Each structure stands twice: as structure tokens, then as C-alpha cells.
Amino acid sequence: MHQVKSFLLLAIDGEKMVVVNVGSCIGCRRCERSCPINGITFNEFPIKCMHCDRNPCLYACPENAIERINNKVVVIKDKCVGCGLCALACPFGAIRIDGVAIKCNGCYKRDVEICKEVCPTGAINNLEEILNNKIQNTVNKFNKLYYLYANAK
């Protein structure tokens, strides 16, 4: 029988995708408690901003209180009036209003996300690292790596 591993996409920033291995998440909520801006909502698994390329929250904000900084979508709290239009526009439900908009800022001032650092099971990881490890394991196992190219016409 094959073990099914499911991953939940947490954030996209153009360079990195942060994912949660739902099968490894033990629900300890360390990611939620460690977030300095309370940007993670935890139901059965953590829910964070996807930092999507289209930024519907950014365009919905009438006060220009949401900006893209270092490929992360960030709320500028001094500009936010808490109208909630960004939360309505977010397709992932990752923004909540508590006087002002609160969402994951992707730890844009850090090299590594805090939630990833504190996860005791390693359930939070960068997709690039996961894929690189899988590729390396395949190369090590078969000692060869084959590529299939499509004929583009």
C-alpha cells in the first residue's frame, strides 16, 4: 500500500513556495504562536498568506496600505483603516481584521520564516528544498537522471 502525503501550499513569493506537509503536522501551533505579527490562522492546519502574484488584497485596499516588499505582500499598519476590503478580496481567507488588517508578511525582513524554524516535525518547508531533495534521492537511487523534452511547435 502506498502512503499518501499531502502538502498544503502556504506562500508563494515568486522565488519560494512554503508548504506544510499535512501528514507531518501535529497541530502543536508553534508556528502560530511564534509569528510576531499573528499572521497565521490555525484550524486543522496553518493558514497563511499566499503572497500571490495577482495581489487581489493590494488592489482592493482604498488606502494603499498593502504593498509588495521583497516579493512579499505586506500590510502597512500606519496606513490601514481596517475597512476589511482586503479580507473580502483574499481568495484564501488569510487576512483578518482586528482594528487593522493582520496577515502573514512572509518574514520579509528575515532569510528564513520563523514558523519554519520552530516547527518540531519539519512539516513546514520550502517546496524548492523538497523538490531538490526528491531529485537528489532519485539520482542517488538510480545513479542517472533522465529528462523528457516536449516537442514545442
Swiss-Prot record:
Residues 16-45, 40-71, 71-100, 95-129 form the 4Fe-4S ferredoxin-type domain. Its cofactor is [4Fe-4S] cluster. The keyword Protein biosynthesis does not apply. [4Fe-4S] cluster 2 binds at residues 35, 104, 107, 115. GO terms for molecular function: 4 iron, 4 sulfur cluster binding; metal ion binding; oxidoreductase activity. Keywords: 4Fe-4S, Electron transport, Iron, Iron-sulfur, Metal-binding, Repeat, Transport. SUPFAM superfamilies: 4Fe-4S ferredoxins. Binds 4 [4Fe-4S] clusters. The keyword Signal does not apply. [4Fe-4S] cluster 3 binds at residues 49, 52, 57, 90. [4Fe-4S] cluster 4 binds at residues 61, 80, 83, 86. [4Fe-4S] cluster 1 binds at residues 25, 28, 31, 119. Pfam families: Fer4, Fer4_11. This is Uncharacterized protein MJ0264. It comes from Methanocaldococcus jannaschii (strain ATCC 43067 / DSM 2661 / JAL-1 / JCM 10045 / NBRC 100440) (Methanococcus jannaschii).
